[in-house]
Amino acid sequence: MEQYNVTGMSCAACSSRVEKAVSKVEGVTSCSVSLLTNSMGVEGSASPQDIISAAEEAGYGASLKGKDSSAKNASADEDMLTDKETPLLKKRLIASLGFLIVLMYFSMGHMMWGWPVPAVLEHNHVAMGLIQLLLSAAVMIINQKFFISGFKSLLHRAPNMDTLVALGSGASFVYSTYALFAMTNAQMNGDSAGVMSYMHEFYFESAAMILTLITVGKMLEARSKGKTTDALKGLMKLAPKTANVIRNGIEETVPIEQVRKGDIFAVRPGENIPVDGVVIEGSSAVNESALTGESIPVDKEKGYTVSAATVNQSGFIKCEATRVGEDTTLSQIIKMVSDAAATKAPIAKVADKVSGIFVPAVILIAAVTIIVWLLLGEGIGFALARGISVLVISCPCALGLATPVAIMVGNGVGAKNGILFKTAVSLEEAGKTQIVALDKTGTITVGEPKVTNIIPADGVSEEELLEEAYSLERKSEHPLAKAVLAEADKRGIKAHEVENFAALPGNGLSADLNGRKIFGGNMKFISSKVSIPDKIKTEAQKLAEEGKTPLFFISDNMLRGVIAVADVIKEDSPQAVRELQNMGIRVVMLTGDNEKTAAAIGKQAGVDEVIAGVLPDGKESVIRRLRSQGKTAMVGDGINDAPALTRADIGIAIGAGTDVAIDAADVVLMKSRLSDVPAAIRLSRAALRNIHENLFWAFIYNVIGIPLAAGVWIGLFGWKLNPMFGAAAMSLSSFCVVTNALRLNLFDIRDSRRDKKIKQNTVKGGEMMEKTIKVEGMMCPHCEASVKSALEEIPGVEQASASHEAGEAVVTLSADVSDETLKNAIEAKGYKVVG
């Protein structure tokens, strides 16, 4: 996706106009414009020049975002997000208020409350009118941006909010100017009644008040919108500007864009790490909270990776740069959050469609309002006031901002907590999850075996057993051996040199230690060497049932003991699973382990269903089957999880996983904590709830406000709206929507106390029976739909799914249905059942 900066947009109608114009360019497959970040994301083969030209022809400016260096890009993007609008609006507001206060004094203070005026103006109605004209003209000149933008958009046949303001204020001014000339003519003709009549037709104060109140609203809106991008700006500010690079043995400070892959750089305590790298010398504790939200420092030593923008807290380290420029973790996070802001959530489509026709519709309603009141016999002043009220109370911005502000704030909250949503779609859809499929290794479990139990034989201490096991296992490359080595290192146990080491495939290890023959391996192998006491056998079997692997060790034909090794579950996994279940989500664990081991891990984690013996290439088909039962999220971290992550409705990658898994996912968890999965879903639900609130108030505001402004209720209740109050309401509407979205910043994504179960149309694995049928002849999705509908018409079939790629159909049964019945239903549609 190519990113562009866009200038000149003032409301949702503007962004809609740019989007439509660019989407028409040949070669553009998708276009999404963000009013909040003044940016545009475009996909397709169209040239940048054609895209920029299309935006310019629509009346707006566009430029391609630079790609020269992450530091320059971060600085440029940060500059684009900097709130330059609020200071300018503040100056305009102060100047406008100065003239407006004087105008209100002359137009209302003197006329309504008899406030004193200079003697030369006393009873001089023409002079009073002329002063009001000049004062209101001054306010209009100060706020000329509304007129320039509004009428320019009108000429491009794409009216926007500025057009409504310009028409409303302009109409008030033009009619008042006409009334002033008419009053002057009446005074010259000695028509005192005409003078008094026209004097009450002045709307100069309305013209100025509309502009001033809209400016107030714009300033509040700009300030609030600026806060919605705080998280993104905060990430950009983290980008280091310089690095201490060592070249030819000399340390020098260079701009960050000059750092190249393979450069050696030094980082002292208190300094930010400039680029991603690997430690080659020294050790330290690094604060990674800027990227992961985790405040506890992480120990780093030789061979450990470090990331840009994290803080070296204690020791001096030297590192080799592995990722620089746009490839650093920080740059990727910034890009991910920025790209998400440039995308649109499905729920925004309705508001976008309305925004696209809203302004022309309002102009038409205002014109009809004026004509109807004139036909009903009301004066031009009354009719015009109703039409102007319609123009200035209508607010397309509230509709246009309802979704993007909530998406932006939600993405910011996620980023601050180490949860990255790649698109607005993923932020919206994650909260609708009904089934969560968890890969076992590295997701539920730590991902590397650890020693869990040490059971020494009689007369042997734990240290003695571990010492012999350490000496034997240190020459093995097996993952289980590494667990024994890590435990011995942790306890400070020293290994002894062994001789005649041999690895016996499928059995175990053997070696000579100080003249003694030692063996290590599984129960079957060791049982062939010595007799194992029943007590030890029983304990070993119990460990195996818990999903642990018991390793037996003997020396000189004497059992020395058992060391149990297992890939232990993460501390937060059971709690995370409970939270998901409390949210009404069914939790399924996928693993390639045997059923006994899988069941043990599943029981510890508390999942609803365990699917064991799943080969790496089989995860994708399992996810496809689960999707037929409900909206499914897949959580994984490895390369073999990528197809399943892509197939799932929502793919969630654990941050410590591979780049391939992260690329395939819709949501990335920077920390390796499973508890971030319910947190992400919780945040998604909160964001969606906020969007619904915003859309409701934006729609209801216009539904109530426009008829009130048009005078629909005058006959029934006598209600009518002064244009000035309409302008005030318009000013506050967008501000209220943005402020409501900012409430998401206060949302605690870890608080599970308010979780609500949502009604799910899922099928519990233990309550239903599932059958897989091999089918020949399916060639396309239409074939799949035919087979699916045929099966679901059979009584007792709760759900069915079919895949022409896999050549199979899967049915979930709530009652006993014979294979013959299923076969006949499929073959009646012209397909062949082969198994």
Task: Identify the residue ranges that each predicted region occupies.
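Conserved cytosolic catalytic loops of P-type ATPases
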Residues: E26-E43, Q49, E201-F202, K233-D327, ...
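Flexible metal-binding regulatory segments at protein termini and peripheral loops
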Residues: M1-G129, K152, I250-E251, K335-T343, ...
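Conserved ATP-binding TGD loop and adjacent catalytic N/P-domain core of P-type ATPases
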Residues: S16, T29, P269, T433, ...
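Transmembrane helix-loop-helix hairpins at the membrane interface
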Residues: L88-T242, K353, G718-P723, A729, ...
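Juxtamembrane coupling segments of multi-pass membrane pumps/enzymes
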Residues: A186, S192-V195, A208-P269, K300, ...
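ATP-driven catalytic headpiece of P-type ATPases
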Residues: K91, T310, G431-E477, N507-V588, ...
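Conserved catalytic phosphorylation-site environment of P-type ATPases
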Residues: L291, V350, A385, A398-L472, ...
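Membrane-embedded alpha-helical bundles of multi-pass transporters
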Residues: M112-V126, L155, V174, V413, ...
